[in-house]
Amino acid sequence: ESSHAQVQATLSMSKKEYIAHEPVVATVTLTNNAGRDLLIHADDRTTLNWLDFEIKNSRGTSLSPLAAMNFGPVRIPAGRSIAKSVDLTGAFRVTEPGRFRCKAVIRLPEGGGNFVTNTTYFSVTLGRQVYSQRVGDPGRGDVREYRLSIHKTPQKSSLYVHLVDIRTGQ
């Protein structure tokens, strides 16, 4: 029996558009069709995670992980589903404006095979800045800027406050 028949995996994003530096949350849903409980964990021989993400920008360039993502073992009862939500902003540079595509790779242990979820698309924008104010002492190098941005979608308008260290741009 193939791993594809044993586990069904889908990927979804918490939304389609994000403001730069806000959490980009991806959710992987795994359904166990194997007829027995499954324990999915990192491969002890290769130290590969059981879950990885592949993200490409609009030019088709793969984004390299900025940090390792470590996921503990997951038990999926027979006939049941589990969902794992992951904030991708800590592991990938998805803070710059642009359009991205993402898919998840699931590795079953003990040679159970690898498979890939559906591809989802999301974009990151700066929003429209409507106000900014610098505060602090330039002589001491501790100037910060408060920025107010609006982001509109067909469903709603959102107001964001950004606090930026002028020295670092962060």
Name what the model sees in each region:
Residues Q6-L11, E17-I19, P23-T89, P97-R107, ...:
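Contiguous segments within soluble domain cores/interaction surfaces
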Residues Q6-Q8, Q129, Q133, Q155, ...:
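Residue-identity detector for glutamine
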Residues I106-F115, L126-R128:
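Short peripheral tails and domain-boundary helices/loops at the edges of structured domains
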Residues T119-E145:
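Low-complexity, Pro/Ser/Thr- and charge-rich linker/hinge segments at domain boundaries
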Residues P138-V164:
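Short beta-strand elements that form the blades of beta-propeller/WD-repeat-like
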